[in-house]
Amino acid sequence: MKVAIIGAGNMGGAIARGLAQGTIIPASDVTVADPFSGSLETLQADYPEINVTTENPKAIKDADIVILAVKPWLIDQVLSVVHLTPRQVLVSIAGGVTFEQLVKSVGPEQTIFRLIPNTAISQLESMTLISSRNASKEQEQLMLDIFNELGLAMLIPESQMAATTALTSCGIAYVLKYIQAAMQAGIELGIYP
């Protein structure tokens, strides 16, 4: 099974690093595309077996799974250049981009997944939320298997994606804010570190 990741920024790079450490998809079957070669050079220095390219169409040519790891406002632009085949599975990690929006670019028959991972995926510690459209039970299980290897994964309906995204993506920030407030309260009460 070959995977193409479009975008080598924070999340795309983190997913590539996580996949390279896993056992389900060999690192040599992962191709990462990004127009900026600096991100690709850094990624390949860490994981030389990962394939890299600056050309999105080249990256997806033989891919079974195409992961879009670009900013939401770039989705239409990227999908206008890459032309998915019906056998390819599209995975979008762009927050707030719905299936309805993705279908406008790829057509109603395409198998699509929406994923919300977090950057802990590079350390195999992500909590990844998954929604599917036009996917078989086997495809859903494959996504769960892949992303459970990179932390924990849970299949949810798309209608719950926005609310659960706030918890999984921002949850750690809420915890750290509480710790910071507790520390400040301690200082104000005369307890110094």
Task: List each language-model region with its residue ranges.
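Hydrophobic packing within well-folded, soluble alpha/beta domains
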Residues: V3-I5, V66, V91, M143
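Rossmann-like NAD(P)(H) cofactor-binding subdomain of soluble oxidoreductases
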Residues: S37, N56-K61, I65-I130
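A general structural signal for well-ordered alpha-helical segments in protein cores
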Residues: A8, G12, L40, A63, ...
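NAD(P)+-binding Rossmann beta1-loop-alpha1 motif at the extreme N-terminus of oxidoreductases
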Residues: M1-T54, K58, E125-S126, I187-L189
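Internal alpha-helical scaffold of NAD(P)-dependent oxidoreductase catalytic cores
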Residues: Q101-T111, M127-T164, Y174-P193
